[in-house]
């Protein structure tokens, strides 16, 4: 069994894994957006007295479901609390491994186009990684700066940055290489936002309840540094 055969199988496995966990991540995100947009006042006054701010009733797959959202936090946390984070982490990990396998290992074929810019494999990889890292650092700084206090300004600056990044990538890499690094930059921003902003905020909510403190509402709204949502 030669190395090329194994690399083909690894490519296939990573592609399927990346697609599956990516669907799980996006699906979970869309579900909670839908859930938040369809919450209504609890039907049972006792639920409102317990701090429940809204609920949704649904029927699916032959069963009835109800989902309830607290205004801040319950009086007591359950022993089993599900965290929605590994969907994002595994999407980032599988995507990065796939990027390394297809575009960095095979840079001469998939990433470098001498008619666009003559690069060595090492130079191309370094530039590609820099775009992924700098994209996150710029986004994080922008959200934590004064610009993050105005959604319109923030959105406009991010749009301009993305346009500049797309232009630069198209003048550095092949068409495929530019496309995948632009998408990868956005994916890294989203996944690291989960890791560095959203999940730490949720951990603080849980920690406050475990220590008997009143949770800070800003963590529940995921507004650390303002627009990190």
Outline where the language-model segments fall.
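A short, hydrophobic C-terminal helix/tail in secreted or cell-surface proteins
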Residues: 228-229
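Polytopic transmembrane helical bundles with strong interfacial aromatic enrichment
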Residues: 1-225
């Amino acid at each position: 069994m030669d190395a090329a055969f194994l690399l083909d199988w690894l490519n296939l496995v990573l592609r399927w894994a990346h697609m599956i966990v990516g669907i799980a991540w996006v699906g979970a995100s869309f579900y909670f957006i839908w859930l938040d947009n369809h919450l209504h006042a609890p039907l049972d006054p006792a639920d409102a007295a317990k701090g429940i701010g809204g609920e949704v009733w649904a029927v699916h797959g032959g069963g009835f479901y109800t989902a309830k959202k607290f205004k801040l936090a319950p009086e007591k946390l359950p022993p089993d609390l599900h965290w929605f984070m590994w969907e994002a982490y595994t999407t980032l990990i599988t995507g990065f491994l796939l990027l390394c396998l297809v575009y960095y290992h095979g840079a001469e074929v998939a990433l470098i186009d001498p008619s666009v810019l003559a690069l060595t494999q090492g130079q191309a990889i370094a530039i590609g990684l820099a775009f992924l890292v700098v994209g996150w650092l710029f986004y994080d700084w922008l959200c934590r700066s004064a610009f993050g206090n105005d959604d319109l300004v923030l959105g406009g600056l991010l749009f301009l940055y993305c346009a500049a990044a797309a232009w630069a990538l198209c003048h550095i890499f092949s068409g495929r290489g530019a496309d995948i690094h632009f998408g990868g930059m956005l994916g890294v921003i989203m996944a690291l936002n989960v890791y560095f902003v959203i999940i730490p905020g949720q951990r603080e909510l849980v920690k406050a309840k475990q220590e008997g403190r009143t949770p800070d509402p800003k963590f529940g709204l995921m507004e650390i540094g303002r627009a990190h949502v």
